[in-house]
Amino acid sequence: MKMRETSRGQDKKLDDNNNLKSRIALKRLLQITAPYLWDYEKQDFVENPNGKNNSALYIGTEMDTYIELEPTMWAIVSGVEEDKIKDNDLTEEEEERIQRAIKILKDTRLYLEDNPNFDISYLWSAIEEYKINHDICMVAIDYIELNTALTSEFAQASRNMGIREDQVLLELSANIKNIAKELDVFVIAFTQTTDEARKENARDQRAVKGARSLPNKVDVGIVTFEPTKKELEKIQPILDSINVGIGKRTEPNICYSFYKNRGGKIKDVKIWGYQNLGNMEHIDLFCTNEKYERININPVNIQVVDNKITTS
């Protein structure tokens, strides 16, 4: 891991409701870049099926990137829950796993940038630099929102002809899409969600905070929420009919709602799962459509080997 975005040339935007953004971003990146990862079934470290030579970039905007994210990365790679790491409440075996994870991360080609006030020029420059020097295949931007640098940049470009938030964010979204295409990288960008969306249980582009113009340019749009009581009631017949989960746990605690899938056959899909926030272990449970009716989807395996993407 070095301090300082499936297919290439795409950009994906995922909206969620708390610091899950950063954890999901790091989990996605480490699944591609870490040479070894903890296997929960085998209870051991295994070689990353995606290979050992992939590289990626994380651009953070609201944390002391290294200090605050380091324990999260240890937890993801080792499978040891982050609270246990921070509280130093570890067994001897868990301590050994943490030490192994630290060594693995030293050999991981994941680069971290911290810029809470980025503009479009910075994104082009930074991502191009890492593409040229480190051949990155994926970028995670955590997260997108209006800031003074973006506003100033847009004002100069438009000669102060009036500045609206939706215009600035639309320009940002268009440029992120162009970056993905021209630099041949997969970009996953995160936003916050609106309070109104939480109250109204919106699970589509209406949940995107800042501007509805943002989803216009993305290839894949996802909203992530913990299921509400009302949603759990809607899927209760499904829960009653299946036997899945961790032990006796069958109730999902996370739902990924796909509100956009450009060029894809499957649209308006909800993936229900169980997410351990301590180490980001995730178990897919089942899928439904927007009417909360269960549907079957054939799995597709995506691998990134030596920065080349294949599917099966």
Describe the role of every protein-language-model region.
Residues 40-47, 51-52, 79, 83-87, ...:
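C-terminal regions of RecA-like/P-loop NTPase motor modules
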Residues 2-190, 196-197, 206, 257:
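Glycine-rich nucleotide-phosphate-binding loops and adjacent flexible coil segments
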